[in-house]
């Protein structure tokens, strides 16, 4: 399976906008490896993880080029790459610096909160990078105006869609008893961090 996928261009204000999806090669180790293996333990999927990031950049560039060839005026990347130093060379900032043709990157993975950061691409053009953080604290907003891309984070949104709000509340009410049911108790504290504050998950026994 390809690491990058493409959504056929849709018309927005008379322009064709293509959306491409990018998953981090860290998926191999930051999820369950068996998800990507056959019954014999052989890996059957790729995330274009080789050559110190070059395979990822090339695969994304191929996808961007295909979108442009298909008539896209703009290309927006929906990425799950993050900006953590430990994720180099697969960070969203690395990707932008080594590709062209992407007009904006809406990122995830590292749970970073970024309203808009301008990152230079391979041609030196500044590309907006945005990430909404985690747990629905923010809603990301992308605006395209006269060919210019800007991003921002919305934190105060009092107006709700009545139909959606009613639907969500019906699910919450339906599951209220279930989610408040005690299924087990532990005599020890279950923590996600060591005593010194460093993260224990995926680093040591918890």
Segments predicted by a language model, with ranges:
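Conserved protein kinase catalytic core
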Residues: 27, 86, 113-115
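Short, solvent-exposed, polar/charged sequence segments at loop or secondary-structure edges
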Residues: 81-82, 86-91
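Acidic/His-rich catalytic or pseudo-catalytic neighborhoods
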Residues: 2-83, 125-206
């Amino acid at each position: 399976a390809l690491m990058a996928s493409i959504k056929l261009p849709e018309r927005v204000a008379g322009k064709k906008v293509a959306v491409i999806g990018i998953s981090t090669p860290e998926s191999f180790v930051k999820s369950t490896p068996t998800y990507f293996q056959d019954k014999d333990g052989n890996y059957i999927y790729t995330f274009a993880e080789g050559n110190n990031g070059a395979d990822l950049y090339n695969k994304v560039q191929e996808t961007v080029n295909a979108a442009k060839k298909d008539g896209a005026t703009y290309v927006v990347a929906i990425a799950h790459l993050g900006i953590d130093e430990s994720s180099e060379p697969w960070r969203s900032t690395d990707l932008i610096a080594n590709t062209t043709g992407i007009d904006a990157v809406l990122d995830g993975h590292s749970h970073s909160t970024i309203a808009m950061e301008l990152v230079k691409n391979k041609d030196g053009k500044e590309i907006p990078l945005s990430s909404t953080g985690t747990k629905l604290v923010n809603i990301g907003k992308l605006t395209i105006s006269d060919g210019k891309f800007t991003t921002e984070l919305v934190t105060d949104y009092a107006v709700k869609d009545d139909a959606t709000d009613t639907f969500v509340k019906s699910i919450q009410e339906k599951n209220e008893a279930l989610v408040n049911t005690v299924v087990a108790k532990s005599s020890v504290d279950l923590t996600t961090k060591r005593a010194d504050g460093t993260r224990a998950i995926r680093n040591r026994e918890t």
